[in-house]
Every structure is written in C-alpha cells, then in structure tokens.
Amino acid sequence: MLLPSLGGSPAAWNAAMVFFQTLLLAGYLYSHLSLKWLGIARHRFLHAAVMLLPLLVLPIAMPAGWSPPAESDPTIWTLLILAVMVGAPYFALSTVSPTLQHWFAHSDRPGKAEPYMLYAAGNAGSVIALLSYPFLLEPFMGLKQQAWAWAVTYFGFLVLLAMCSLKARSSHDEQITGKEEPASWSQRVRWMAYAAIPSVLLLGVTRHIGDEIASFPLLWIIPLTLYLATCLLYTSPSPRDED
C-alpha cells in the first residue's frame, strides 16, 4: 500500500522494520508487565480490550489525504502512516506469543514447563508468510481483497484466542514448578545488547543491499528471512530437550 507513494526506497523499508521491531518490543513489554501485575484472571479483561481494538481500524487501508513529503526525508512520515494504518493490529498481534506462552505454562497441558516452543511456531509462520506472499498471494488478490481477507481471518483468530484463554488457570498465585531466581539487571542488559546486535546487522545489511546492489524488495526479504530462520532454529526444541 505504501510502495506507490514511497517507491522502492531502502530507507522506507528500514523505517518500516524499525517500526515493527519497536512495536514488537512494546507488545512483549505489555504482556510481561500486565500478566505480572494483574494475573491471568484480571489480565483476560484487559487483553480482550487490546485484541478487540484493531477491529476499529479494519480493514487496513491507506488514509485519505496522506502523502509523503516531496522534498524532505520520508522516514518520519513512514513511521506515522504505519502507526495510523497498522499500529493497533500489529501491537495486538505482538502480544500474542508471550501471552500464549504464559497461558500454556499455567495450563494442564503436557510440556507446560517449556512453553518456548511457541516462539518456534511463531517464527516458522513468519518465514512461511514472508516467502509465500510475493508468489502465492500478491499475484492473485488485490489490496482491497487482501485487506478484507485479513480482517476476516483476524476475527476468526480472536475466537481461537478466546478459547485458549479458557485453558489457563485463573489463579495468579499458582507458581510453575522449578521456577528459577529472577535475572539480575546486569544479565537483562546483556540479553538486550545481544538481541540488539542481530537487529542492527539486519538493518545495516538490508540498507547496503538497497544502496549498493539493487533497490528491489525481493532482495530485501533475504536478510529478514535469515534473521527469522535463525530465531526459528534457536527456539526450536532440540532432540536432547525431547529426551
């Protein structure tokens, strides 16, 4: 939707990736703090509001009257238009993985002590969607059709999410067996630094490809695919874990 206005600018792609990574971090932070402070029972009501909020802006469409600046850097404009168009839906979706992991860990399902396999499932879905969209979806559906299909799919997803929430125990006082001591702040800072390194490399390599090789969106997805595939490998359970 933005390409007709911005063209094939690598700066626009990088701005979009910064936007989505920042909002993803915000969604994780929301899930962590709200579940910690409210517990599962009260969190359900807050999370229901968060997940229903995107319905107010669906189907996703380009706002009327918005056009990028003709002579200045479009980065700020790109961030603003993304916030208006997909800010609420993406923030809601960014909360799903950590929330589902918490619910799963507080359910009666086998393997609840290691809910991180859901990260692998989410990363696998991201890789499949990223690689299949240019070849299986975009050539056969217009933007309006895609927007409406996404809106209908999101509504169905909400129904499934509500069913999952009922499987989690309501008591926020229950503790997972084998819980470790909280990490120190020095450990947390190191973890954030380690996570920032591949993100910075992703942006830098993508910008280099766009500036020095070709300003071609299909090339830009290669670094992102490798980034997601690495996350998939890291979060997938190993044979030793299954033993």
Put a short name on every predicted segment.
Residues M1-S236, R240:
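Alpha-helical transmembrane segments of multi-pass membrane proteins
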